[in-house]
Regions:
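Structured mid-domain segments that build the active-site/substrate or prosthetic-cofactor binding neighborhood
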Residues: 1-61, 65
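Flexible helix-coil linker/hinge segments at domain or subdomain boundaries
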Residues: 1-8, 91-105
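Short, glycine/acidic-rich hinge or "gate" loops at secondary-structure transitions
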Residues: 9-26, 67-76, 102-115
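Short beta-alpha connecting loops at secondary-structure transitions
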Residues: 38, 72-80, 157-162
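General structural feature for long, well-ordered alpha-helical segments within catalytic domains
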Residues: 50-53, 84, 88-92, 145, ...
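Short secondary-structure subsegments characteristic of cysteine-rich extracellular domains
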Residues: 68-95
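Catalytic alpha/beta core of large soluble enzyme barrels
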Residues: 111-166
Length: 166
């Protein structure tokens, strides 16, 4: 029960170190041309807290709890697995919203939750809240799996929906 809060806090500590480095050591908002031109401002700055690997997390937990029905009950293909994914993201969102982040007045002093898009080099882990590539259910089921997460991500959710293969 304390694993998720622990790892959210460790990730937040890493994010805070990066924010402090950007502002205090690199003095980005004092020296970068975007700031000099007035295009960015420290008062509007916000950090993003990214989620990555939700599908694998859900699938591992379903198997660990003996509820995966031989691999059939997995994220994107099973109501219980999908509900578990939503519960995980809701809890992460609560923890991120509770955690102050310095210099992030653009986000009300907190990080924005972000569902990362991933890159082609990602191996054995799926980006953000996405369903693993190649394991996507039919389009409407795919959308129904991913849509319940969207309201929790002020900085966005990246996904790919295959409407037409051409």
């Amino acid at each position: 029960a304390d694993m998720l809060p622990r790892y959210v806090e460790l990730t937040a500590e890493l994010g805070e170190a990066r924010v402090r480095s950007l502002v205090e050591q690199q003095r980005f908002f004092d020296t970068h041309w975007l700031a000099a031109e007035g295009l960015i401002d420290i008062d509007r700055f916000a950090a993003m807290f990214g989620i990555f690997g939700l599908a694998e997390c859900v699938n591992l937990l379903m198997a660990y709890e003996g509820r995966d029905r031989g691999g059939e009950a997995r994220y994107g293909h099973d109501a219980d697995a999908n509900a578990l994914g939503v519960r995980i993201v809701e809890r992460v969102a609560e923890l991120v919203a509770e955690r102050p982040m310095p210099y992030c007045e653009g986000g009300g002093g907190r990080s924005y939750l972000h569902s990362q898009s991933g890159i082609d080099l990602d191996d054995a882990v799926t980006a953000g809240t996405r369903i693993p590539v190649g394991d996507e259910p039919p389009l409407l089921d795919h959308i129904a799996t991913c849509a319940p997460h969207h309201h929790l991500f002020a900085s966005g959710v990246s996904d790919i929906f295959h409407v037409d293969e051409t």
